[in-house]
């Protein structure tokens, strides 16, 4: 039997204290949907000059999931990000856009971060892709959530949209990011300890919805898009 995941290891602040999905309190509580528009804010202090970047969303955030990939922005010390999507047409930068810069111009998802605090405000796909037209965002950056600026009471409770984190994706990618996958005999587990402990804890939260890619429904969307583009599937008129 694998030992429990060390309390010193953070999956993500929104996940660390969630109960087991098999417990009587079962799944994550379903918070009410945040009022629209949702305002996301970087981690620069309100008193800084020229102040934090602000982004507004006119749609609820969908498909929230824990992502272990090495590209997503994660809170300090966390193994996973929590990320979801909104229509690109409903996202606007309303304050201090000049502080934004692209993390990696060659990446499929153009992630725009704050030059000063490093927080990713949104990720956009410009090239042909099944998810083009959707922007990737971190709902925890909503005002009133842990990442937002204190004293601004909008969107109290954050902007997770659908109200919960649905699944875990790209779990094995945390190893690429520096998580030691093996428990060491001498007890010195460094940054990690045991990837099985991580998977076991994620299954306590998400049940069987723990993947090394995206969820099956989203992978089906990608596969169908590729099939229609290649002509192996009939075009939808």
UniProtKB/Swiss-Prot annotation:
Belongs to the Gfa family. Gene3D superfamilies: glutathione-dependent formaldehyde- activating enzyme (gfa). Its cofactor is Zn(2+). The keyword Manganese does not apply. This is Putative glutathione-dependent formaldehyde-activating enzyme. PANTHER family: CENP-V_GFA DOMAIN-CONTAINING PROTEIN-RELATED (PTHR33337:SF40), GFA DOMAIN-CONTAINING PROTEIN (PTHR33337). The keyword Lyase applies. Zn(2+) 1 binds at residues 42, 44, 114, 117. It holds the Pfam family GFA. Zn(2+) 2 binds at residues 67, 69, 72. Its EC number is 4.4.1.22. Residues 38-152 form the CENP-V/GFA domain. GO terms for biological process: formaldehyde catabolic process. Pathway: One-carbon metabolism; formaldehyde degradation; formate from formaldehyde (glutathione route): step 1/3. Catalyzes the condensation of formaldehyde and glutathione to S-hydroxymethylglutathione. Disulfide bonds: none annotated. Keywords: Lyase, Metal-binding, Zinc. It is an enzyme of class 4 (lyase). Binds 2 Zn(2+) ions per subunit. One of its GO terms (molecular function) is metal ion binding. InterPro entries: CENP-V/GFA, Mss4-like_sf. It catalyses: S-(hydroxymethyl)glutathione = glutathione + formaldehyde.
């Amino acid at each position: 039997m694998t030992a429990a995941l060390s309390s010193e290891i953070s999956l993500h602040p929104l996940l660390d204290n969630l109960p087991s999905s098999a417990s009587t309190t079962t799944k994550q509580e379903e918070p009410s949907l945040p009022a629209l528009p949702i305002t996301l804010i970087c981690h620069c202090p309100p008193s800084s000059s020229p102040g934090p970047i602000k982004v507004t969303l006119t749609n609820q955030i969908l498909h929230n999931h824990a992502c272990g990939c090495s590209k997503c922005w994660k809170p300090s010390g966390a193994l996973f990000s929590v990320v979801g999507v909104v229509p690109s047409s409903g996202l606007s930068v309303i304050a201090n856009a000049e502080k934004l810069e692209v993390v990696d111009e060659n990446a499929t998802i153009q992630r725009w971060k704050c030059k000063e605090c490093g927080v990713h405000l949104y990720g956009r796909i410009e090239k042909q892709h099944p998810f083009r037209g959707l922007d990737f965002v971190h709902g925890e950056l909503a005002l009133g959530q842990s990442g937002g600026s204190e004293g601004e009471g909008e969107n109290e409770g954050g902007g997770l949209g659908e109200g919960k984190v649905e699944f875990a994706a790209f779990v094995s990618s945390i190893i690429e990011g520096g998580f030691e996958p093996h428990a060491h005999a001498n007890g010195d587990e460094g940054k990690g300890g045991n990837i099985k402990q991580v998977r076991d804890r994620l299954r306590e939260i998400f049940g069987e919805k723990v993947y090394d890619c995206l969820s099956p429904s989203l992978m089906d969307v990608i596969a169908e898009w590729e099939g229609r583009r290649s002509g192996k599937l009939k075009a939808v008129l």
